[in-house]
Curated annotation (Swiss-Prot):
Gene3D superfamilies: Ankyrin repeat-containing domain (1.25.40.20), Transcription factor, SBP-box domain (4.10.1100.10). It is found in: Nucleus. The keyword Coiled coil does not apply. This is Squamosa promoter-binding-like protein 12. Keywords: DNA-binding, Metal-binding, Nucleus, Transcription, Transcription regulation, Zinc, Zinc-finger. It holds the Pfam family SBP. Disulfide bonds: none annotated. It comes from Arabidopsis thaliana (Mouse-ear cress). A motif (Bipartite nuclear localization signal) lies at residues 184-200. GO terms for molecular function: DNA binding; DNA-binding transcription factor activity; zinc ion binding. Trans-acting factor that binds specifically to the consensus nucleotide sequence 5'-TNCGTACAA-3'. Residues 371-399 have a biased composition (Low complexity). Binds 2 Zn(2+) ions per subunit.
Length: 927
């Protein structure tokens, strides 16, 4: 499975998963988007805008594609009219009328995709069973559509394609006989799924009657509304047909959600210029009036006389805009994530009765989004699997988190963006975001803004999204916001605006079995080329695809639903999927997002990942993958905070390397509080490579807020590493030397550096149990200052590290250092016997370094003492034995022995007492 840049994908839907590629859609490859400055630059200046039909006149292939697209649309219009007429004749309910707006037939799953026949078929339709040939032109539409006669649809065996098969009543197609249980008319897979749904009843459905059906219908209507709004702004759009579809859609919306949606939409459409046929708007008004006639409490007001009303789905609640004190009530009733398939002109919408929520996965849904039963402002989670991790209190910035805002601007192109777009967004958000990054992609324009701001700002934005959107429209009179349709989504809240006025504000229920979500992405950190494995819910449903977003570039996953038909029906609803995604990163260091675009066409979930050129850094960050599997836990939330924060830091560092020094704003520097959270997180896990990367970024000018010296003095990293008893981290810090302005800074972390209370790392190690390894590393620093400070460095109370070890009873520490001290002078002050003193002094002065006069540090010598001695004194091949100390000792012993022997062999004379003594006269034995 490969990935391409989105603008290069041929024949793939670029908006909402609808059929074909919009012939007038702008190409992402023709524009360069600066996600930090919110500026779009056209790369191909020789061609006009992609919305102009003149830009493709010379391209025969594109013109042919346009002609085919027009034919497809005309066929869909005809199918829609036939479907509506049939529904009216059969007096079907408004749900079916609405769900046929897309021009597709709705039957059970697995239906073979064919177009509805609006008139006499061009050729006779026969049964597909071998040697049958039954004419199906006058039979039921069901049999015509599936090309099977009534007899063979109920037969136990039928020869199709030379293979004995049987027609499945639920799949509406033939299967081999091995797929059926004895006596069953449905295949084993479909029957098992059907029984599973029947056994597991949904409490919401039981308690609320048709609530699930209403939610499902509203979801289809909302998705159809998005499609119609997109088609309206296409040059190939049939305006009259779109308006007719919109009329029927609004009729169904009114019947489902009350008068307020329809009345506001009608008023706005009458006053706006989005649709050109005024007579159709009048028909729409009459239609809505007829729909609301049975209601006696309706009060008719003109648009100018009626105060602005906010629309809440399924609640018919009315509020005046200035009065914001009353608590807003929102009912989960709309869901963009239900199935909507329109991949080609012969595709039907596959719909069955809404199955109950799967209890096996309902708990997972609850953990993924606790906002189902609580207001947005009281929950720490949202609909996106990656943004629902709230920062931990250890970060020092506990009330801030990273999330995103998604705009869909209908009928707009990149050249419609104002120069001050970023300033308009910041003014709208009251300059609360500390970090902000944006992406655009086709589909009119889908503008995604990832930002980090405090929790109170997110709460205010989501609690009253219509008020927030109206504030944006009031602050800016730019046509980008005030002309045409606008769609806004924040977490699970969405709002629509038309011609500068908000017409819809509702919540998306995430309990739907069609909801798609990313749970984890592996690997969490990648280098240049990556092979991702995405784990999520309903990733392989029709109409879904994965997007990899890196520095403004969208890489699209192809063949999202590969192997979909071979999946067991027992795993179709809210089951865990694994999808592979291969791509090559366009950057060496930074952060990217994995997004999923569901049936509604907008990305419903995202997950961040890190890009680094150092494989060791990636391997350390990947250790968080197992932690993130346990979604909803504190450790998983803290891990996600780290990914977001280090992603923002790497993004700033990469941005700083691209921009000139004059472009840096001191207010945009990364705060020390956030940097401290990254340091502490890496220190707790002993990530030496990540720590080294963070320290290198610290010494980059224009990235982190304070000066490096002030930051290091406050962080006391070596003290932290000693307290963690981490020898690898201590060794890394002692040898760390960043390069700054072509100069290497050495000795930043010293064992004798005084911290709080005058305590040095040596004091801390001497007072801790089991710190032999750390103490060994501290006394082996490159400058050898640790071994000297063992007896000399004193804290505020006057105690040395040796005193701490003695008081704690750590005599092994004292012996460890003493052994090093005893070895040091022997290795440096060894003198050979009988070397002339004058030479010794001169030679030692020549080899003495400046450091020897003030410290006991060992200096590096090229050769050993013995080789140095040989080089100076070797003048002849015959050496005297006197220069051999061992030989001298042996000679001395021999001389002593000879003297003793001679003494006892002589005849000493003892006067006045005995006769002269002789050895021969000496007797032995007892006397």
């Amino acid at each position: 499975m490969e990935a391409r840049i989105e603008g290069e994908v041929e024949g793939h839907s670029l908006e909402y998963g609808f059929s074909g590629k919009r012939s007038v859609e702008w190409d992402l490859n023709d524009w360069k988007w600066n996600g930090d400055l919110f500026v779009a630059t056209q790369l191909n200046h020789g061609s006009s805008n992609s919305s102009s039909t003149c830009s493709d006149e010379g391209n025969v292939e594109i013109m042919e594609r346009r002609r085919i697209e027009m034919e497809k649309k005309k066929k869909r219009r005809a199918v829609t009219v036939v479907a509506m007429e049939e529904d009216n004749l059969k007096d079907d309910d408004a749900h079916r009328l609405t769900l046929n707006l897309g021009g597709n037939n709705i039957e059970g799953n697995g239906v073979k995709k064919t177009k509805l026949g609006g008139g006499i078929p061009s050729r006779a339709i026969c049964c597909q069973v071998d040697n049958c040939g039954a004419d199906l032109s006058k039979v039921k539409d069901y049999h015509r559509r599936h090309k099977v006669c009534e007899i063979h649809s109920k037969a136990t065996t039928a020869l199709v394609g030379g293979i004995m098969q049987r027609f499945c009543q639920q799949c509406s197609r033939f299967h081999v006989l091995e797929e059926f249980d004895e006596g069953k008319r449905s295949c084993r897979r479909r029957l098992a799924g059907h029984n599973k749904r029947r056994r597991k009843a949904n409490p919401d459905t039981i308690g609320n009657g048709t609530s699930m059906s209403d939610d499902q219908t509203s979801n289809y209507m909302l998705i159809t509304l998005l499609k119609i709004l997109s088609n309206i702004h296409s040059n190939q759009s049939d305006q009259t047909g779109d308006q007719d579809l919109l009329s029927h859609l609004l009729k169904s919306l009114v019947s489902q959600a009350g008068e307020h949606i329809g009345r506001n939409l009608v008023g706005l459409l009458q006053g706006g210029g989005g649709l050109q046929a005024s007579q159709n708007i009048g028909n729409l008004s009459a239609l809505l009036s007829l729909e609301q006639a049975p209601r006696e409490d309706i009060k008719h007001h003109s648009v100018s006389e009626t105060p602005w009303q906010e629309v809440y789905a399924n609640s018919a609640q009315e509020r005046v805009a200035p009065d914001r004190s009353e608590k807003q009530v929102k009912v989960n009733d709309f869901d963009l994530n239900d199935i909507y398939i329109d991949s080609d002109d012969t595709t039907d919408i596959e719909r069955s009765s809404p199955p109950p929520t799967n209890p096996a996965t309902s708990s997972l849904d609850y953990h993924q989004d606790s906002r189902q039963s609580s207001p947005p402002q009281t929950s720490r989670r949202n609909s996106d699997s990656a943004s629902d991790q709230s920062p931990s209190s250890s970060s020092g910035d506990a009330q801030s988190r990273t999330d995103r805002i998604v705009f869909k601007l209908f009928g707009k192109e990149p050249n419609d963006f104002p120069v001050a777009l970023r300033g308009q967004i910041l003014n709208w958000l009251a300059h609360t975001p500390t970090d902000m990054e944006s992406y655009i992609r086709p589909g009119c324009i889908v503008l995604t803004i990832y930002l980090r701001q405090d929790e109170a700002s997110w709460e205010e934005l989501c609690c009253d999204l219509s008020f927030s959107l109206r504030r944006l429209l009031d602050l800016s009179d730019d046509p980008l916001w005030t002309d045409g349709w606008l769609y806004l989504r924040v977490q699970n809240q969405l709002a629509f605006a038309f011609n500068g006025q908000v017409v819809l504000d509702t919540s998306l229920p995430l309990r739907s079995h069609d909801y798609s979500q990313i749970i984890t992405v592996r690997p969490l950190a990648v280098t240049k080329k990556a092979q991702f494995t995405v784990k999520g819910i309903n990733l392989r449903r029709p109409g879904t695809r994965l997007l990899c977003t890196v520095e403004g570039t969208h890489l699209v996953q192809e063949a999202t639903q590969g192997g979909m038909e071979e999946r067991d029906d027992l795993k179709e609803n809210n089951e865990i999927d694994f999808v592979n995604f291969s791509c090559e990163m366009p950057i060496a260091s930074g952060r990217g997002f994995m997004e999923i675009e569901d049936q509604g066409g907008l990305s419903s979930s995202f997950f961040p990942f890190i890009v680094s050129e150092d494989e060791d850094i990636c391997s350390e960050i990947r250790r968080l993958e197992s932690t993130l599997e346990f979604t909803g836990t504190d450790s998983a939330m803290q891990a996600m905070d780290f990914i977001h924060e280090i992603g923002w830091l790497l993004h700033r560092s990469e941005l700083k390397s691209r921009l000139a020094a004059s472009d840096h704003n001191p207010e945009d520097l990364f705060s020390l509080i956030r940097f401290k959270f990254l340091i502490e997180f890496s220190m707790d896990r002993e990530w030496c490579c990540v720590m080294k990367k963070l320290l290198n970024i610290l010494f980059e000018e224009g990235t982190v807020d304070p000066s490096p010296d002030a930051a290091l003095s406050e962080l006391c990293l070596l003290h932290r590493a000693v307290r963690k008893n981490s020898k690898p981290m201590v060794e890394m810090l002692l040898r760390f030397s960043p390069k700054k302005k072509n100069q290497t800074l050495a000795g930043l972390f010293r064992p004798d550096a005084a911290g709080p209370g005058g305590l040095t790392p040596l004091h801390i190690a001497a007072g801790k149990d089991g710190s032999e390894d750390v103490l060994d590393a501290l006394t082996e620093d490159p400058g050898m200052t640790g071994i000297q400070a063992w007896k000399n460095s004193r804290d505020n109370t006057g105690f040395t590290p040796e005193d701490y070890a003695r008081l704690r009873g750590h005599f092994s520490y004292i012996h460890l250092v003493q052994r090093k001290l005893s070895r040091k002078p022997i290795a440096k002050e060894h003198v050979v016997v009988n070397i002339p003193e004058s030479f010794n002094i001169e030679h030692k002065q020549e080899k003495r370094s400046p450091m020897d006069s003030s410290s006991l540090e060992i200096t590096q010598i090229n050769q050993c003492k013995l080789c140095d001695h040989k080089r100076v004194f070797v003048t002849t091949h015959h050496k005297s034995v006197a220069y051999r100390p061992a030989m001298l000792s042996m000679v001395a012993i021999a001389a002593v022995c000879v003297c003793v022997a001679l003494l006892f062999k002589s005849c000493p004379e003892v006067l006045y007492v005995f006769q002269p003594f002789r050895w021969e006269l000496l007797e032995y034995g007892t006397s």
